[in-house]
A protein has these predicted regions:
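Small beta-barrel nucleic-acid-binding modules, primarily SNase/OB-fold domains
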Residues: 3-5, 13-136
Length: 136
């Protein structure tokens, strides 16, 4: 069912040029969170959202440095978009991992969440492909 909901969301949003509100459910790591999105007055779906064009360290990273930075990035994301807060999703596309979407995300203050993480050195720009290693 969740894969179907993601497919419906991606198809609907692929032609949309507007932002869609979503309620933050759970922060998974520094660049991924779950969100509840209302399709209509009676239907809300939960989706996993990955911040578009951002890479943060992995929670199960290759070295202690990466794992520590991953916790810091996750905690910072939780400060920028607290659980229960409303965010705006735009430029929504299907992610390479089924069941997840990529999107630009703005918080309640109107800040681009990915840009904040990059500016504050919790993440770096990412345009797909092979990730640069975080371990030295």
């Amino acid at each position: 069912m969740n894969k179907f909901c993601v497919a419906v969301l991606v198809c609907a949003w692929s032609v949309a040029t507007f932002a869609v509100p979503a309620r933050v459910g759970h922060i998974l790591d520094g660049d991924t969170f779950s969100a509840a999105v209302s399709l209509d007055a009676d239907t809300t779906v939960s989706v996993r959202v990955r911040l578009r064009n951002v890479d943060t360290p992995e929670m199960n990273g290759d070295c202690e440095y990466e794992r520590a930075r991953a916790v810091a990035a996750r905690d910072r994301l939780a400060e920028i978009i607290p659980v229960g807060s409303t965010v705006e999703l735009s430029n929504v596309k299907d992610d390479k991992y089924l069941g997840r979407i990529d999107a630009n995300v703005k918080n309640a203050a109107g800040d681009d969440v990915g840009e904040v993480l990059i500016r504050e050195k919790f993440g770096r720009k990412y345009n797909g492909g092979r990730r640069k290693p975080w371990c030295k």
